[in-house]
Amino acid sequence: MKASDQYHKWVEWSDEDHIYIVKCPDVMTGIHGDDPIRLYSELCDVVDEVIQHFVSEGRPLPRPRIRPMQEVL
């Protein structure tokens, strides 16, 4: 399992902006565009790069906080 696999990633459509937005909130805000499959792949690459940066700096990885079906209070 890759370190990035522990972080929830999702794709959503923005009716307001008429674009797809992909997010990984525990690691970064997100990116947007018109091809959800390409965007998801790019997001995974960026998350891997962010994790590599954390490791190279000797910083701990962010704790995964977002989970699918997590109860919202």
Where do the protein language model's features map onto the residues?
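Short, charged, surface-exposed hinge/linker loops at domain edges
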Residues: 1-8, 17, 37, 41-73
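Short aromatic-glycine-(Arg/Gly/Cys) micro-motifs in beta-strand/loop hairpins
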Residues: 11-26
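A short, exposed loop/beta-hairpin motif centered on an aromatic-Gly-Thr core
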Residues: 24-38
